[in-house]
Amino acid sequence: MNIISVGVNHKTAPIEIRERISLSEVQNKEFVTGLVSAGIAHEAMVLSTCNRTEIYVVPAMHEVTGEYLKDYIISFREAGKDVRPEHFFSRFYCGTARHLFEVSSAIDSLILGEGQILGQVKEAYRIAAEVQTAGILLTRLCHTAFSVAKKVKTRTKIMEGAVSVSYAAVELAQKIFSNLSMKKVLLVGAGETGELAAKHMFAKNARNIVITNRTRSKSEALAEELGTNQVLPYESYKEHLHEFDIIITAVSTKEYIISEAEMHAAMLKRRLKPVIILDLGLPRNVDPEVSKVQNMFLKDIDALKHIIDKNLERRSGELPKVHAIIDEELVAFGQWINTLKVRPTIVDLQSKFIEIKEKEIERYRHKVSEEELRRMEHLTDRIMKKILHHPIKMLKAPISTSDSMPSRVDLVRNVFDLEEPNQSH
């Protein structure tokens, strides 16, 4: 009863290789249903994101190994000779479970603690469940992974603290001003970085966001998406600097777009009410001399990266707690797997003893009285339970490092001459 995981991720393969292995939702469904319908797997699921494509399989044949699955997906995607087995990782049994628990907990992510991955794991399971390729094992594995991720999020700080420049900027603004809903924000630049910063601001309850961009249509599109519908002409935004508590700049330029003199004038109009400028440009958008203006807080990318590094360091310090949670859940999952493995043997063992008992009782059915027969049945039941107690207890006991469940099952089946079980997995 094995579970195999095989795949490529940011640790094992460069992006050009990962791109050639990735699966769309349609391809995902075709792949997993193909594995099951061909009798290659009892169960199958694929997790495919920008950073990883991972296959989770309960094999239906002894020939289905990690190497087999690597070759299978390379062929399925027609990935070419450049994609080789060494670009893949392989995990088996509890190693597969540990890997999925680590992925779901965001400690195997490109950015430690990046919380988006859990939603992607849930989506992978949804697809497999929808096409009915997630059976009892993968269903239990995934739901345990979801539980692990929830415990990690609530019991540790692995996901706390900004680890992107745009989010770090917003987090810093919130620390300075506390309630962003009461502040007026100017976003200069509606490119990818500016858009992310605006969306993070909106998520932190900032609603009074004004956008300016060289191309007005981009300003209007972002403002409409946020629901603010507030834009300023790029040519005249400097005339309004004094109106804003928070200014975020994210434009591509070789010249400073805000000078010390401009901010000094703006601060006089504000009567020195504090302003924070978050310069997300590279090269910098704001003259560093602006920081000399009274009540002006200027933070550029280097300052924000220092915050990010500190946050990542704190997240790394939470790893022992995360691993402890994973270890705890891994033991519970392993014990559940073991109960599935031993259940047929326990049933067969009990059935064999009941059959022996009934045959022996039948031999005396017409030789003794009904009362004596009842006593014999009662006595043989007690003897049978005492004989079976130890082997059943041994089968149910936790696995030690020097033991294995298959060896226990084989031992009991051989000693008591039980036929090989007919199992679906």
UniProtKB/Swiss-Prot annotation:
SUPFAM superfamilies recorded: Glutamyl tRNA-reductase catalytic, N-terminal domain, Glutamyl tRNA-reductase dimerization domain, NAD(P)-binding Rossmann-fold domains
Site (Important for activity): residue numbering on this chain: 99
Pfam family, one: GlutR_N
GO biological process, one term: chlorophyll biosynthetic process
Pathway participation: Porphyrin-containing compound metabolism; protoporphyrin-IX biosynthesis; 5-aminolevulinate from L-glutamyl-tRNA(Glu): step 1/2; Porphyrin-containing compound metabolism; chlorophyll biosynthesis
Annotated protein name in UniProt: Glutamyl-tRNA reductase
Binding locations of substrate: 49-52, 109, 114-116, 120
Alphabetic keyword roster: Chlorophyll biosynthesis, NADP, Oxidoreductase, Porphyrin biosynthesis
Subunit structure: Homodimer.
The family this protein is said to belong to: Belongs to the glutamyl-tRNA reductase family.
Reaction equations catalysed: (S)-4-amino-5-oxopentanoate + tRNA(Glu) + NADP(+) = L-glutamyl-tRNA(Glu) + NADPH + H(+)
The species this protein was found in: Chlorobium phaeovibrioides (strain DSM 265 / 1930) (Prosthecochloris vibrioformis (strain DSM 265))
Gene: hemA
Domain topic, free-text comment: Possesses an unusual extended V-shaped dimeric structure with each monomer consisting of three distinct domains arranged along a curved 'spinal' alpha-helix. The N-terminal catalytic domain specifically recognizes the glutamate moiety of the substrate. The second domain is the NADPH-binding domain, and the third C-terminal domain is responsible for dimerization.
